[in-house]
């Protein structure tokens, strides 16, 4: 009888200890740190995308902070990030072409491209950050994002697959695909 009572008490206290360590506040998220595919750096932290998830590494205190849909981002599966030193904000592009701008730990959503019904192929090929703007080279043309105002400034539907763009000497250059060694040039007027 004494052994049975000891076993019951031991079991009771074991379950009590396990219950004390159980997370009752909700889900715990484990993000992958493998297969890093995008890294951007600010003055005080490094932004990293690994397997579609975003985290930051604090340079001063070696801290790691995770960002995901459950704690402030507006979508899942990040495909690309770009940091704008002028606006001190991070442009986040998701696989479905949804866009967030992260500034001071707060994400502002720009769903224009992902929710547009007039654009069929919404693939974002690359991003150029210049001044306070981000130029998104897409399967249909160029989308200009004003990162300071957190808004879509312009959309240029060129019916061309623009893989990248560059700004030099007051002009914006865009290579044409599939024609090699041909490019489209336009006058660069940011305002």
Q: Where are the language model's segments positioned?
A:
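Bacterial Sec-dependent N-terminal signal peptides
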Residues: 1-26
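Beta-propeller domains
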Residues: 49-69
């Amino acid at each position: 009888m004494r052994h049975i009572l000891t076993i019951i008490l031991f079991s009771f206290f074991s379950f009590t200890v396990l219950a004390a360590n159980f997370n009752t506040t909700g889900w715990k998220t484990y993000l992958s740190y493998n297969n890093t595919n995008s890294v951007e750096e600010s003055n005080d932290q490094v932004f990293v995308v690994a397997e579609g998830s975003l985290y930051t590494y604090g340079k001063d205190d070696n801290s790691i902070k995770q960002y995901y849909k459950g704690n402030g981002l507006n979508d899942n599966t990040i495909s690309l990030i770009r940091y704008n030193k002028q606006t001190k904000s991070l442009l986040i592009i998701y696989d479905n072409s949804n866009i967030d701008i992260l500034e001071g730990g707060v994400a502002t959503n720009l769903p224009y491209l992902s929710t547009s019904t007039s654009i069929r192929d919404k693939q974002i090929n690359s991003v150029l950050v210049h001044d306070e703007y981000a130029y998104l080279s897409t399967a249909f043309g160029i989308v200009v994002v004003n990162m300071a105002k957190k808004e879509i400034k312009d959309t240029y539907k060129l019916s061309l697959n623009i893989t990248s763009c560059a700004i030099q000497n007051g002009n914006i250059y865009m290579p044409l695909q599939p024609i090699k060694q041909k490019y489209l040039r336009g006058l660069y007027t940011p305002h």
